[in-house]
Amino acid sequence: MSNHMSIMKFLNQILCLSLILSISMTTLSFAQTCSKYKFSSNNVFDSCNDLPFLDSFLHYTYESSTGSLHIAYRHTKLTSGKWVAWAVNPTSTGMVGAQAIVAYPQSDGTVRVYTSPIRSYQTSLLEGDLSFNVSGLSATYQNNEIVVLASLKLAQDLGNGGTINTVWQDGSMSGNSLLPHPTSGNNVRSVSTLNLVSGVSAAAGGAGGSSKLRKRNIHGILNGVSWGIMMPLGAIIARYLRVAKSADPAWFYIHVFCQASAYIIGVAGWATGLKLGGDSPGIQYSTHRAIGIALFSLATVQVFAMFLRPKPEHKHRLYWNIYHHTIGYTIIILGVVNVFKGLGILSPKKQWKNAYIGIIVVLAIVATLLEAFTWYVVIKRRKLEAKTAQHGASNGTRSQYA
């Protein structure tokens, strides 16, 4: 009974520590700095917004009577060989349909600035006319900062209370060729809605326009909890809880419940991944996708193999056990690897990755301690049974669920 209580205490510690680490998040607030900025050209704008990603700022003056929008887009903290873009999307949120202004420094010290309509995810940002008139287009590059100035002639009646969809972006260059921007982290978050009258800006997803980022987060949470935490925890329960005789057959049902729950949640996460892939034809994460498909396939085989599990005394039970353990540990390894792959794609705040690393470290430490404790209990039990057994034939009663 004491052995059983010790193991249960370890498992409770796993659950508590996992919960604490998973909710240990901090909120990052953005300091308003655009209002203090002074343009060298003495330009003055009525309003400004600190954009939440990519170290960017938008200064603007909106004339609702004429539909004229005068803007200064500032992109700071740039390294050499970078291009930047700011766009209005008249038809939807996001990249496709955006009417962009693109700028990048040239080798002669000047800045090339031009307009580019974006019609697909495979855009090369070629120069072209926008769906509205643009005048006064210019750009400067100084102190690792590009400033783009332009006047846009929007519709006098925007039809949605003066709100526009905006997108801003940056990427690397090869010579004078623009390379695709990164497809993870802040580069996929840089969309928002802006009310030109009130000056209120909000993330596009929060405004109801685009739910892609929210779907990515849901996908990550579902798969992180299922494949990355519950699957390893279920394996720990099966391996170490059954050493306590009083836990037989409870350990088996706890193990099945944990793994079945992980599978159901994991399938939901896998399905959201397929949906995200279908909604983003120009964005591919081949390794992450391949591991995800392999995980789903192996886990599905593992679930259905339970219906073919021989009885403990059957001659084929040994082979089934070898298969079950091999597939199970493969799923755990692939699951953890793919969670880290997903974190690399999402590029969330550092606390998320640190929290997951903490959970995995805790699980690994607990598993190591339980492994040593289990061997101690088993060896001690066998010695005791050898002393008390008649004719040396008794090696303990085997669980029918093992």
Swiss-Prot record:
Molecular function GO terms recorded: metal ion binding
UniProt xrefs under InterPro entries: AIR12_DOMON (IPR045265), Cyt_b561/ferric_Rdtase_TM (IPR006593), DOMON_domain (IPR005018), UCP037471 (IPR017214)
Cofactor note: Binds 2 heme b groups non-covalently.
Keywords (A to Z) from UniProt: Electron transport, Heme, Iron, Membrane, Metal-binding, Signal, Transmembrane, Transmembrane helix, Transport
UniProt-recorded name of the protein: Cytochrome b561 and DOMON domain-containing protein At4g17280
DOMON domain ranges (all copies): 54-171
Entry domain remark: DOMON domain could bind catecholamines and thereby could regulate the cytochrome b561 domain function. DOMON domain could bind one heme b.
Domain of life: Eukaryota
Signal peptide: 1-31
Cellular localization per UniProt: Membrane
Gene Ontology terms: cellular component: membrane
Membrane as UniProt keyword: yes
Positions annotated to bind heme b 2: H255, H324
Cofactor(s) the record lists: heme b
Transmembrane spans: 218-238, 250-270, 290-310, 326-346, 359-379
